């Protein structure tokens, strides 16, 4: 580390000048990789380990990071600190070695908190919409020339990265409630998009515990900070009297401080008016579909307005918004003649949503923008516990499509739970009599099983949080055409 880099570090996190080498266990994850990228650009020596290369590790390697595709004790040698993701177990050999060598082991959010400590932090929390809202806030601040640092859980498509080091005082970050680690953060501004029952194992199955944790997160704001909250959400409306900080509400509700009105969707764009108390109305064109994205934009506008950002910069950023990876991500439109001999085309969209509320929002956006399309979904349930806990909600939501193909549950390290598998879910949906789901037991056969349900005027939603995104890219590469011998290069 040279003198110039050390000087930069002292100006950002003064006491972290004592740290030289930071090692990340599970560095290929989007959240971990984003923080590693910011720290690499700040001049720290970065190393990390994961099981396989991916775009995140490739980006970090290009920045000079050392990446190990294994988990071995010697990987943490000479590290000043070891950062671990919540997905890593305590018996990981690198964590064990770090403890034996008395190297501090911290969670991702603790490192993010250190980055935020000496900056104007804006943290975006909530069950749904965090990633997109983080990208919208970042885009507005960048358009206004404020050069923010951002750390996001998904790819910010305009920047081509999950995270970027800016040179201003602003740090915009997604705040993760899945393991309650967002309690480490002490931002100046916090957005809460909504609160629903998810990741309930963390909260011992107690929804009141989850709600109190969000309140505790907001109490990390200084008394002069601000909470920006969606008043359309019934849980947030219930919790507002307990926040104890300055608040700005947003939503379609008439009593919202920033109110969405006259929403219309035309194709992939939303058009609406934002009414702000004591400020001119904003007539917004948002380059993202769905009423849920209008709410995300309202949150971003509330924060930007509070900061005094020019309205023209806000409107430009939203109209040119390029979205985030795997959030209603348009992968192409393909002719069906080579696929199944039919005239016409099929659009292919990839989406990360894996909670019934998210899936429902994606379906509604697709129906609103393309009402005449045959809506086909390839769905991969994520985690047996989530499938069990939200089983009826999934069954209700998934009956809204015209054709449904379902992959096996992506376990994310969980053991199977009887009755919470894809076969059972398909049977339940079939018994409701609206659609006849197709169970896809072999991912290599997706294109072959998809072809017969396509009509020539289709919108295909590839939906889920597991490895189904790889399948979406594979379908795009082969232009939906079944292969004679489909290789599992996607799974």
Swiss-Prot record:
InterPro entries in alphabetical order: Mur-like_cat_sf, Mur_ligase_C, Mur_ligase_C_dom_sf, Mur_ligase_cen, Mur_ligase_N, MurCDEF_pg_biosynth, UDP-N-AcMur_Ala_ligase_MurC
Q: List UniProt keywords, sorted A-Z.
A: ATP-binding, Cell cycle, Cell division, Cell shape, Cell wall biogenesis/degradation, Cytoplasm, Ligase, Nucleotide-binding, Peptidoglycan synthesis
Catalytic activity from the UniProt record: UDP-N-acetyl-alpha-D-muramate + L-alanine + ATP = UDP-N-acetyl-alpha-D-muramoyl-L-alanine + ADP + phosphate + H(+)
Q: Name one GO biological process term.
A: cell wall organization
Pathway terms, separated by semicolons: Cell wall biogenesis; peptidoglycan biosynthesis
Q: Where in the cell is it found?
A: Cytoplasm
Q: Which GO terms describe its molecular function?
A: ATP binding; UDP-N-acetylmuramate-L-alanine ligase activity
Name the predominant localization.
cytoplasm
Assigned EC number: 6.3.2.8
Q: Does the keyword Cell wall biogenesis/degradation apply?
A: yes
Can you list the GO cellular component terms from the UniProt entry? cytoplasm
- Which Pfam families does this chain map to? Mur_ligase (PF01225), Mur_ligase_C (PF02875), Mur_ligase_M (PF08245)
Residues bound to ATP are 126-132
Q: Which family does it belong to?
A: Belongs to the MurCDEF family.
**What role is this protein assigned?**
Cell wall formation.
- State the name under which the record lists this protein: UDP-N-acetylmuramate--L-alanine ligase
Q: Which gene encodes it?
A: murC
